[in-house]
Each structure stands twice: as structure tokens, then as C-alpha cells.
Swiss-Prot record:
Species this protein is from: Drosophila melanogaster (Fruit fly)
Metal-binding in keyword set: yes
Subunit structure: PP2A exists in several trimeric forms, all of which consist of a core composed of a catalytic subunit associated with a 65 kDa regulatory subunit (PR65) (subunit A). The core complex associates with a third, variable subunit (subunit B), which confers distinct properties to the holoenzyme. Component of the Integrator-PP2A (INTAC) complex, composed of the Integrator core complex and protein phosphatase 2A subunits mts/PP2A and Pp2A-29B.
Catalyses which reaction(s): O-phospho-L-seryl-[protein] + H2O = L-seryl-[protein] + phosphate; O-phospho-L-threonyl-[protein] + H2O = L-threonyl-[protein] + phosphate
PTM: Reversibly methyl esterified on Leu-309 by leucine carboxyl methyltransferase 1 (LCMT1) and protein phosphatase methylesterase 1 (PPME1). Carboxyl methylation influences the affinity of the catalytic subunit for the different regulatory subunits, thereby modulating the PP2A holoenzyme's substrate specificity, enzyme activity and cellular localization.
Cellular component GO terms held in the UniProt record: chromatin; cytoplasm; cytosol; FAR/SIN/STRIPAK complex; INTAC complex; nucleoplasm; nucleus; protein phosphatase type 2A complex
Gene field: mts
Binding annotation for Mn(2+) 2: D85, N117, H167, H241
Protein name stated in the entry: Serine/threonine-protein phosphatase PP2A
Amino acid sequence: MEDKATTKDLDQWIEQLNECNQLTETQVRTLCDKAKEILSKESNVQEVKCPVTVCGDVHGQFHDLMELFRIGGKSPDTNYLFMGDYVDRGYYSVETVTLLVALKVRYRERITILRGNHESRQITQVYGFYDECLRKYGNANVWKYFTDLFDYLPLTALVDGQIFCLHGGLSPSIDSLDHIRALDRLQEVPHEGPMCDLLWSDPDDRGGWGISPRGAGYTFGQDISETFNNTNGLTLVSRAHQLVMEGYNWCHDRNVVTIFSAPNYCYRCGNQAALMELDDSLKFSFLQFDPAPRRGEPHVTRRTPDYFL
């Protein structure tokens, strides 16, 4: 196997990953190199056309990702936009992120994958992905290939110039999409500043900017969302990052929607998951789904902290 992934290789890898079987370390390296090539050409505000199905956090819940594709349609038949947090917490971060990256490399025009706050070296060392890579490969190389790749993921996407999609939320340092386009994203997620805020902030019932209980990013009120949408000619901010019990939740007088796509989050929260389908004319509908039937989860001791639910 050379360092070139042919279409035939990719199809075979995708087939294997669909069965929840991991790739070899060498195959992952080849895949990540190819993905970097593709992602390096994408913008900080990646343009996406409708129709497209928008998804929130997946967090290594591989069987629920399979359920998501069953409900929403297979890739590439359905166009997808994922808003980050592919790894950590679930038991199958390796298979989940490898599959999404393989689909991106195989069908680059049909799937968009954004960066979430968990697509970071620091966070993955605490919340499970690093340990899982060590357990499944016997060393940290695969973790390194993926976390290096994460620096290339676009920060936000813009669907038909109107619906702005990102993982976390708005930033007091950013008024316009051009400010986002000007950021240097090829780095670890910083502890503060605009790039950090886009991946960490949350909408709030209180107006204005507030200090985030997460220790990174800000909270922002309806006044902020309305101003941002008006300034940038947007109809909606679509984001993920927060567990919502019904899988989706409107706030800020429908200026913001939260979408969460990991059902029964952490295998214990009891929430539904959802997808937002945008049709040819940007009309939205939500599809809710429950966890895939489980055939015995692995008995893994969980040592990850419960903070940041």
C-alpha cells in the first residue's frame, strides 16, 4: 500500500469502517494526509449549497452515527454538514472519526466536516480519544495523525449565504464573516480569542456578553444574535455543543438553533438526537432519532470527568 489512497482503497476502507472495524495505522496516516490536502483548500467560512442535512455532536457513538445515516440517508446520496465533536466520551471515537474523514476524502463535495472544541490535542487527552487510540493501536501515532488533521478543519460553514453553521457560537471579537475568513485556523484551539469563542460559546437567556461557565468562550444574548444576523444578511445561526433533550432547540426568537446528534448521550442522558434537513429552497425540517439497538457495549472503565456535559 503506497501513500496514495485510490478510490478503490477508499471504498474498501469505508466498507470496513461501516462494520465498525478500524483501519491500520498506515492506512490512517495515508487517509489523514489526503484529507489535509483537501481541507487546506477549504475556507474558514466554507460555502455549502442546499439541499444539505446538518448534524451536531456525535462523540464517538458509532452505532448512533449508523442510525443517523439510516434516518438521514447514506452518504453520498444525502449531502451532510457536521458541526464538530466527532471524538471523546463515546466508545468508538476511532471508528467514528475515521469513517467521517474517509467519507470526506471520497466524496469531498457531498460532506462538510467542521471543527468542534473536542477536535483538539488538549481536550482529547482528557475525555477519551487519546486513551482509546492507545488501547486500540498500542501507541499514540493515530491520535497524532488525527489531532494534526484537526488543525485543518474549517471553523464555520455558510449554507446558501443565509444559514451560518458552527460548533459553539459567537465572539465579541467578531462582527462579520470577513473577520472569520481572516483568522489563521491552522493551529491548536487557543485558550481565548475569536477562534476559541467560535468553538466554545453558548447562547444565553441574558442579553449581551457573559462569562461562560465552561471556562472558555462566552455566553451571548438575543441582542447579539440579532445584530450578527442582520449585519451579515443571515436568517439563522445553527450550532451544536450543548445537550438538548429533544435533539434540537430554538432560542433567541429563532435566530439560533442548537442541534445535538448523539442520542442517549454518554449512554446515560436519555436525550433524543436530531438532524436538520435543509431542502432546495432552504426550508428546514427536523428528524429526531433514538439510540441504535445495542448489542453489548464493551466493558471499559470510564475515568473521564463528568464536567462539560
